[in-house]
């Protein structure tokens, strides 16, 4: 019997059956607009279908040019587009899967000048102001949705998902925040929800009755003047009556200032929201957000919070998620850690999606995994992210890999990251690598510091020896008050009540998060997370915001973060997560000061110049987070001995601690060697 009986139970939809309860949620990949995008998307989706996903939803495709995500974005409004899409649907069907096209009109979020919305109100995350739709333009758009659905059916899709959540066009009609009309498309809620209902009716009429229609409904807007639970319930009933097959419950607008999918969000944090609709409708409900583990999904389904679970990024992290779970090999799942660094953060700067823990995601055709033509004896020095990625992938191809590390455990910088409140998921990546090292027969030698002579018998050596913290040239840098971030995070050096952190990059923010944490991290407690971020769990307020707002605990220490640069502290943090770290630290009372000159460190504290004024920061500790130097001492003697040496990870480029680059480097080299 399966360990996950609810997860692998089929779902009967009347005219078709889904083989299990998992939806691969919509993700824009950046492939949708590329010349070879159809081939790459076909490979991407087909691999997930092959391993058992019941129903895949594509990235959002606009029904009209006004609704694209950005200039040049993908549209499906003409038969000339069908061949592109048939390539994708054929590939999925050949693997026994089903696939639905997401119809997405981005409304006032469309990042191009010709955007439209119910009212001419600029979104806080867009520099363009939308044109207010006329009555006739609204009718045309409804027909555009229906036409897009018809074309999707002709292209071989098994259904469509009508995107009515996350603050996009349909959601904008629903909320008083963005709909200030006083005609038949605005005013009271009955008129505000008319557009959504008419879209679903038109889609059903045009696409036929034996066609899946998922409606993504915003359950929890997390913005002021959003929808109430009563309104959401009324809409859900109307959407069912209009012809939807399934309702997928969305959480949060893109402009919301509450985290909904990043690592600090507890697993399955919002399934309780979906459950509130269970008695209101008779069609299946999908719950979503931070479901990255088969047991979490099973528990949600078993207690009746939803009929299906949606997972998106977990299928970037591991295409084999479902087959591994079904074969009772969940320990081999490469878990999504919710970092967003290689997926959403790349999409928002116009790059193709990938995955920090799985660089092959969306690059399957460019990074094939082939058996090694001539297996080699390979030495890998350093069991951090880069070395682990190389060792596992090279061994999987048939190479004989020996992995050395001077420390008693694998992980390198990930052993630092996993201690940061809100980054507990990094434990999962190390669990995955430990499992795969054993599975692929890597000879792991911990507590082993090697010399160049120890490596001479190997065919090639891969140096993944990482970095050493860099100490800036400040008078008094050797004072007992001074600690490196490794002293604090790895060695647990005592830290006093008043702290200055030099450096506002990623490691500086991590150190500040660690030192400012009071009690247990809310990333492990859904109730406390909702309280901390001001989510009204009764759902009585419009938008689901608690009247008292966020309740983030104050730091037990006085902390000031400093940087030499005049730019905003944390400017280099991820676009989708940096604001969370800044907001958290500021709410805790942490100060951030740019454009600082460091004069000296002595018994009194840290002497600085800020804005031309000399100041004394009377602190107990000065924690240095000001960059790092590569550790590559073994490279020159090995090369002098005529050996082939490869540098990956921090020992190659130490400018920033970049796990995405490190794992990608290790993986690419392993697939090529």
Language-model segments: residues:
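Flanking helices and flexible, charged tails adjoining ferredoxin-like Fe-S electron-transfer domains
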Residues: 200, 364-373, 383, 396, ...
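A short helix-to-beta-strand connector/capping loop
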Residues: 305, 437-444, 478-481, 555-557, ...
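Rossmann-like dinucleotide/flavin-binding elements
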Residues: 376-406, 445-453, 457, 465-474, ...
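N-terminal Rossmann-like dinucleotide/flavin-binding domain of flavoprotein oxidoreductases
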Residues: 412-458, 570-596
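Short beta-alpha connecting loops at secondary-structure transitions
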Residues: 257-263, 284, 307, 414-422, ...
């Amino acid at each position: 019997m399966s360990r996950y009986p609810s997860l692998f139970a089929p779902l009967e939809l009347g005219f078709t059956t889904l083989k299990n309860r998992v939806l691969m949620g919509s993700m824009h990949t950046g492939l949708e607009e590329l010349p070879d995008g159809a081939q790459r998307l076909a490979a991407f989706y087909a691999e997930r279908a092959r391993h058992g996903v019941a129903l895949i939803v594509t990235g959002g495709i606009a029904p009209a040019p006004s609704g694209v995500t950005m200039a040049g974005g993908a549209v499906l409004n003409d038969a000339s587009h069908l061949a592109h899409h048939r390539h994708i649907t054929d590939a999925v069907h050949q693997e026994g899967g089903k696939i639905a096209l997401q119809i997405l009109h981005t409304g006032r979020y469309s990042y191009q000048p010709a955007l439209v919305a119910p009212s001419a109100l600029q979104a806080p995350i867009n520099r363009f102001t939308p044109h207010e739709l006329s009555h006739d333009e609204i009718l045309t758009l409804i027909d555009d949705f229906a036409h897009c659905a018809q074309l999707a059916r002709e292209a071989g899709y098994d259904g469509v998902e009508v995107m009515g959540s996350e603050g996009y066009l349909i959601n904008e009609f629903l909320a008083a925040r963005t709909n200030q009309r006083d005609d038949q498309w605005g005013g009271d809620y009955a008129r505000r929800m008319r557009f959504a209902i008419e879209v679903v009716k038109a889609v059903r009429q045009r696409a036929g009755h034996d066609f899946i229609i998922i409606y993504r409904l915003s359950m929890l807007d997390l913005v002021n003047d959003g929808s109430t639970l009563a309104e959401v319930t009324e809409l859900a009933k109307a959407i069912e009556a209009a012809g939807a097959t399934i309702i997928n419950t969305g959480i949060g607008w893109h402009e919301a200032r509450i985290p909904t999918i990043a690592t600090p969000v507890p697993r399955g944090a919002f399934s309780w929201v979906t459950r509130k609709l269970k008695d209101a409708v008779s069609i299946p409900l999908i719950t979503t957000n931070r479901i990255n583990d088969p047991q979490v999904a099973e528990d949600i389904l078993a207690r009746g919070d939803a009929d299906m679970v949606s997972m998106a990024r977990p299928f970037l992290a591991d295409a084999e998620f479902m087959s591994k779970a079904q074969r009772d090999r969940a320990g081999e799942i490469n878990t999504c850690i919710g970092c967003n660094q290689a997926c959403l953060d790349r999409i928002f700067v116009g790059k193709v999606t990938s995955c920090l823990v799985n660089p092959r995601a969306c690059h399957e055709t460019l990074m094939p995994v082939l058996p090694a033509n001539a297996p080699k004896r390979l030495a890998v020095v350093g069991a951090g992210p880069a070395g682990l990625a190389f060792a596992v992938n090279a061994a999987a191809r048939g190479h004989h890999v020996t992995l050395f590390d001077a420390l008693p455990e694998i992980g390198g910088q990930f052993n630092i990251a996993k201690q940061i409140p809100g980054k507990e998921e990094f434990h999962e990546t190390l669990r995955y690598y430990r499992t795969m090292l054993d599975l692929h027969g890597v000879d792991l030698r911990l507590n082993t510091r090697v010399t160049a002579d120890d490596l001479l018998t190997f065919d090639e050596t891969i140096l993944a020896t990482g970095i050493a913290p860099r100490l800036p040239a400040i008078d008094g840098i050797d004072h007992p008050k001074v600690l490196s971030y490794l002293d604090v995070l790895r060695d647990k050096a005592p830290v006093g009540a008043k702290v200055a952190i030099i450096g506002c990059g990623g490691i500086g923010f991590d150190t500040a998060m660690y030192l400012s944490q009071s009690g247990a991290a809310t990333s492990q407690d859904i109730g406390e997370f909702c309280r901390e971020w001001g989510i009204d769990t009764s759902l009585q307020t419009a938008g689901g915001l608690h009247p008292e707002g966020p309740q983030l605990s104050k730091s037990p220490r006085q902390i000031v973060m400093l940087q030499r640069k005049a730019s905003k502290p944390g400017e280099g943090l991820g676009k989708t997560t940096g604001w969370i770290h800044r907001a958290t630290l500021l709410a805790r009372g942490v100060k951030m000061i740019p454009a600082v000159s460091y004069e000296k460190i002595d018994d009194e504290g840290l002497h600085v110049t800020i804005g031309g004024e000399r100041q004394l920061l009377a602190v107990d500790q000065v924690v240095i987070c000001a960059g790092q130097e590569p550790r590559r001492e073994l490279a020159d003697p090995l090369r002098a001995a005529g050996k082939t040496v490869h540098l990956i990870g921090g020992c190659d480029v130490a400018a920033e601690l970049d796990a995405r680059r490190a794992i990608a480097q290790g993986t690419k080299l392993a697939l090529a060697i």
